[in-house]
Amino acid sequence: MIERGKFRSLTLVNWNGFFARTFDLDELVTTLSGGNGAGKSTTMAAFVTALIPDLTLLHFRNTTEAGATSGSRDKGLHGKLRPGVCYAALDVVNSRHQRVLVGVRLQQVAGRDRKVDIKPFAIQGLPTAYQPTQLLTETVDGRQARVLALPELKERVEAIDGVQFKQFNSITDYHALMFDLGVVPRRLRSAADRSKFYRLIEASLYGGISSAITRSLRDYLLPENGGVRKAFQDMEAALRENRMTLEAIRVTQSDRDLFKHLISEATAYVSADYMRHANERRSHLDQALQLRRELLGGRRQLLSEQYRHVEMARELEEQNGAEADLETDYQAASDHLNLVQTALRQREKIERYQGDLEELSYRLDEQSEVAAEAQEQYESCQERSEAAEAEVDELKSQLADYQQALDVQQTRAIQYQQALQALARAQTLCTLPALSADDVESWLEDFRAREEEATELLLQLEQKLSVANAAHSQFEEAYRLVARVVGEVSRSDAWQAGRALLREWPALQHQAQRVAPIGARLAELEQRLNAQQDAERLLQECVKRSGRDCDAQQLDALQAELEAQIDTLTQQAADAGERSMALRQELEQIAGRVGTLSARAPAWIAAQEALNALESQCGETLEESRAVTDQMQQLLEREREYTVERDEIAARKGALEREIERLSQPGGAEDARLIALAERFGGVLLSEIYDDVTLDDAPYFSALYGPSRHAIVVPDLAAVRAQLAGLEECPEDLYLIEGDPQSFDDSVFAVEELEKAVVVKIADRQWRYSRFPSLPLFGRAARESRLETLYTEREALAERYATLSFDVQKIQRLHHAFSRFIGSHLAVVFDNDPEQELRQLQQRRGEIEREFTGQDAQTQQQRQQLQQARELAGLLNRLVPQVGLLADETLPDRVDELREELEQARDAARYLQQHGATLAALEPVIGVLQSDPQQHEQLQQDYQQALQRQRLTKQQAFALTEVAQRRAHFSYSDAVGMLGENADLNERLRQRLEHAEADRSRSREQLRQHQAQLAQYNQVLASLKSAFDAKRDMLQELQQEMQDIGVVADASAEARARTRRDELHAALSENRSRRNQLEKQITICEAEMESLIKRLRKAERDYHLMRTQVTQAKAGWCAVMRLVRDNGVERRLHRRELAYMDADELRSMSDKALGALRLAVADNEHLRDVLRLSEDPKRPERKVQFYVAVYQHLRERIRQDIIRSDDPIDAIEQMEIELARLTEELTAREQKLAISARSVANIIRKTIQREQNRIRMLNQGLQSVAFGQVNSVRLNVNVRDSHAMLLNVLSEQQEQHQDLFNSNRLTFSEALAKLYQRLNPQIDMGQRTPQTIGEELLDYRSYLEMEVEVNRGSDGWLRAESGALSTGEAIGTGMSILVMVVQSWEEESRRLRGKDISPCRLLFLDEAARLDAKSIATLFELCERLEMQLIIAAPENISPEKGTTYKLVRKVFNHIEHVHVVGLRGFSAAAEEEHMAQPLEDTPA
């Protein structure tokens, strides 16, 4: 017997109160005794945490922090730990005597959430000498210990030989190891399994009847019938798949038009694009060639235009040069005319100013004389006035000095000194050293006489000087005139130079008068010379344009030749126009014919393709309409033959199907009624008992039992006898054999075996001889052998049937094709080929276009020649009238001579214009130049000497007068003597002052009069001088301008200048007209060239672009053609009728097909992606790839092993037969796979019966369990009434609900749910789907109700409820239920675990004090009988006799809590108290 595994010990490290404590666990009951808070719950919590380290489940409600606000976060674990690393470890020895240490490392996580970090680990192969506390702690200083961290623990364990350390990252792996080693009773694969296990442990820990377990006892006790359920699901999935396949077949059959639509639209989509690219490629080639022709023609035209432009530019340059010369001449003529007009106006101004100057000169001379006399008088009067003023001032000063001297004695001395000074000054001026105050009067009279004499002499000299000035001014004027004309000349040579000038004056006047006649003659000759030059230029241009040399005499012949050439070119242009019109008419006819043939060609091509398809299908050549009708009649006869043969094959196939169905019955029963009877009688079919017989023994046993091989083996015939009377559904012969199906043998018959036969002695008077059958059907091997043969034959018949059906349908399809061909194409199929005629017309149109191109070039050349000839003729028409002028060769010389004469005359005119007035003024005064009045200077010197002498005598007289006036001051020799004299002197001074003031007044009046008169004279003189200077300056400017103009202004000069200007203006206008014409022509030519260059660039760009496109399209087209030919779809895509549609129609056709294809492939991801990729217009090969993908898709949708066709449409039509055959096979398969409602009911009933028997066996183990008034505990398993009704209907009344089970829209689960709802309408199903409800109904557990019942006192069996039981009774009853659950789990998991493993059994019980002694003894007995370990917590008054008891006392030492533990063995066996191994002194880690 396998020994059950046991938990050896529990170790707590660094828990609250337990630093390092190991509890050795008893093999039965371990009791934790102690008061409140002693650590019993902490110990159990450590065990549970090591067993189920899932923080989502752990919740220790009975904690020391009960009622704390953080309890919801703590879950009761954080408060049981101390800071630092903590451990909880279980030491286990399993059935294989393998020691394993499983546990967890716990550590508080810092923070307010009071979280705990848990890491599970396991240690295998640990020797028994090592204790858990030795591994988890390390001794420090002898009496202290330190808790090892998990990495340190790993290092320590791995250092021990043969020991394995495993750390787990998931709880699932941790529990998987514990299950394999037999630590936990069941495999905990998921969180739900862990939750069930924890709920069981929790219910055990807190005791009582757990509602969480009793409400879901089915989940805890009844194992999930996964195999049966999976079989149902697989069968249902097979049925679902079968039905889906059938539905897909029906959809495929119904979507035949859709597939045709897919291939037709794909063909339209791809072929339209294929032919559009083909047309575009051909069009691009034609366009490239056309662009190249246009490019080459444009280049030729550009060269011609450039040559023409160069010629016109050269002519324009010549015209510009001539125009520049003409403009210069015209501007010179205009300037000359303006100069002549300006010179005439200047001459008039000069004459007017000269007259004004002569008048002003005369007036200025008169006024100068008058002003000079007035100036002399004013100066004389001013001197006299100044003298009077001085005298008055002196007298006043003397009188003031005298008055002052009267007051001051010193004044006299001052006056005396002043008198002496005046005397000294008079002596100096008068050169009289002996002058004294006494003789001053005599000298005063003398000097006054000298003053009068000097004044008279001065007046005489002044009169003489004025006369000499007049003579000198005439000589100076004449000398100035001569110097103005000839420049610097000596005064002695002035008379000779003047006479020479006056002698040349008449000749110059005569020469100047010839300017007008010479200018008129010169203008006429210059006009002729200009005309001659213009004619020469025209002649040179004619020579240049005609390309040959010719002189003036050959111009008439050249003009006649040009007129003939113009007529010829005009006639050629008319002929070319008529030819072009004829060619255009022919082109229009060709275009009309091409349009007609293009409209006919698609129908003819389609008819030819249909005819070729018919010929390939029937294998005959159809050359006329009669052959088509004959072939159609032959098809009808072949169809009738194939149809008859197909019906015969179908009958044979049906017979095989029935035989296969009969042999496929389960258990070898050929009649389904036998299975129902066997279930009813509780027996087994004989064929089922011998189902495993070999193929070699099958003939023997078949002959042995003979007709009774379909018998039913029943345990008791007497029990069956009563049921035979009411049998209705049974075979005609029903054999019943009594025997045990589990140990049945063939000893019931007396048998004698013969050669290939047996003799069976049924009775003494009845024997049965049976030969061995050639095809034995007794036993599964024999039936399978026969079925293989039948399957092979059926497949052959099915293949033949499919072939015949295919042939019939093929003939029918061919017949329909013939019918459609006759209705659609027969009228045009045998007409002439329109494409051949189209090719001929295209060739002719190409010839006409080439002829058009050549004719256009020729017409352009003729047009240019005609234009050049007409321009040359216009030049000749202008040149012929000027032939005589071209012959005059002396004209330039005459013009040069006249230009020299005109220049001389103009020089004379300019000289006279500059010096004519001077010579006219010089002529009357030329005589004064003969004598030079040189004495004029001597006279002036005398005048100056007299003037100096007159001033000196005046000063001497004034000085003597002052001495005479101060003569009285000489007597101031002393102050006293001077007082009397001062009175006389004062009177004299006053008298003299009065006379002096009267003289001063008269002098002032005379001075004012002379001053006013002088100012008036000077003002008049200044105005005259200003006017004279202005006139003279203006005259000089006018004369200078006249000299600068350099034009002789005569009467005819203006007329000649105007005529010359008008002639030049006319020539310039003509030249500008020609230049403008040339500029316009050049502009037009440049515009044409620019337009032509743009067209050429565009044409070149278009040509290169088109060539690039053609090249790229060629590469892409090659890829497309390669892809098309490799996949063999060229015949499908190259539809010639589409070649007659334009690009827009083809694009529209492709777009329409694309829209239809998007809808058609919306459900096919692959085709949808390929179609999306094919929409790229730059990748045409992708459309072909899409077409190939459609072909491949359609090929995959058909049976390629049966259908032999490359055409998807034909293959789809051929597939119809195969689909029909598959439909029949799948229908038969569905009938075989169909889940029988009766069989489902039987399976569920059998499973329910088996589980009820298992629960009954579990109840037997609890019959002797008693707690208080509870005498026994049991589980009651009943079938729910609603579900029992469902089972009855499924097994007996299923025919009434065939609408549910035969519906193809409902699965079996859904039909089962609908039936359940129909039978129980009062039950609310909620939001669950029928599929979910049906799957639940396939689970047998949903049919059962489980209750816990107790036999309590006189009440008998009652439902176990906490309210009806005492606390101890409830705890015991709950413990009994948990033991039953653990046993159930072990049995359920036995097949998953090793056969040599018997798992550990351990439960908890907290607060065991509520149990009485008898109940405690019952628990001990239950643990002993079931080999179960139990950990209970009891107060101090509990002292069980068996097991191990730990006394826990929590103490505080040095502010540190620790739990003091004392262990006690059961005293009934050994009444001795022994202390368990005391741990190391608890110290903080």
Curated annotation (Swiss-Prot):
Q: Which GO terms describe its cellular component?
A: cytoplasm; nucleoid
InterPro entries associated with the record? MukB, MukB/SMC, MukB_hinge, MukB_hinge_sf, MukB_N_dom, P-loop_NTPase
Decide whether keyword Secreted is in the record. Answer: no
Q: Which residues form a coiled coil?
A: 311-480, 519-665, 832-1115, 1209-1265
State the family it belongs to. Answer: Belongs to the SMC family. MukB subfamily.
Record comment regarding domains: The hinge domain, which separates the large intramolecular coiled coil regions, allows the homodimerization, forming a V-shaped homodimer.
Record text on subunit structure and interactions: Homodimerization via its hinge domain. Binds to DNA via its C-terminal region. Interacts, and probably forms a ternary complex, with MukE and MukF via its C-terminal region. The complex formation is stimulated by calcium or magnesium. Interacts with tubulin-related protein FtsZ.
Listed name of the protein = Chromosome partition protein MukB
The organism is Edwardsiella ictaluri (strain 93-146)
